[in-house]
Curated annotation (Swiss-Prot):
Protein name stated in the entry: Lipid A deacylase PagL
Catalytic activity: a 3-(acyloxy)acyl derivative of bacterial toxin + H2O = a 3-hydroxyacyl derivative of bacterial toxin + a fatty acid + H(+)
GO CC, alphabetical: cell outer membrane
Domain of life, source organism: Bacteria
Listed EC numbers: 3.1.1.77
Length: 178
């Protein structure tokens, strides 16, 4: 018992390595994800439902697999300091493509529709409540049911209405797959 007390970090690393060694990426039956992001004077938290994989293609050789998995989500944004308005809600529907380059690593990208509860946020006018969400990221499958990732997202109305300053955010993601 004394050995475990003195070597907790080593024990934790070995346990995590063993858990990861058995993880294999498979098309999912769906899941939920939680995202926390930081932008220029604002932050965002998101809860997404990931549908089951709609489409999957296994490449030949060692090129991995490409999956299409839509994400339906709700986000809450809040501004730092006295920026006005100080908060806004967002709903989104984003088809995400995930390229599983091996058993555990993936690269993802997606573009989809989002709707904000206001056309102003954090001292910015965003032109319209409708915005496109552009996402690119990468991640790692920890266990067959758990994955983590890093994602960059850009939201703008693509010039449909002025002004169109866009909102950018970098997020840490955690997903529990069913």
């Amino acid at each position: 018992m004394q050995f475990l007390k003195k070597n907790k970090p080593l024990f934790g690393i070995v346990t995590l390595a063993l858990a990861c060694a058995t993880a294999q990426a498979q098309p999912t039956q769906g899941g939920v994800s939680l995202h926390y992001g930081i932008g220029d004077h604002y932050q965002r938290v998101t809860l997404n439902y990931e549908t089951p994989t709609l489409w999957s293609h296994q490449f030949g050789g060692n090129w991995g697999r490409l999956d299409l998995t839509p994400e339906l989500g709700a986000s809450y944004w809040w501004a730092d300091g006295s920026r006005s308005p100080g908060h806004v809600w967002q709903a989104s529907a984003i088809p995400m493509f995930r390229w599983w380059t091996g058993e555990r690593f993936y690269i993802e990208a997606g573009i989809g529709a989002t709707v904000f509860s206001s056309t102003s946020f954090a001292d910015k006018r965003i032109g319209s409540a409708f915005q496109f969400g552009d996402h690119i990221g990468l991640g790692f499958l920890l266990t067959p049911s758990n994955r983590i990732g890093l994602r960059y997202s850009h939201f703008s109305n693509a010039g449909i209405k002025e002004p169109n300053p866009g909102l950018d955010i970098v997020q840490l993601t955690y997903t529990y797959q069913f």
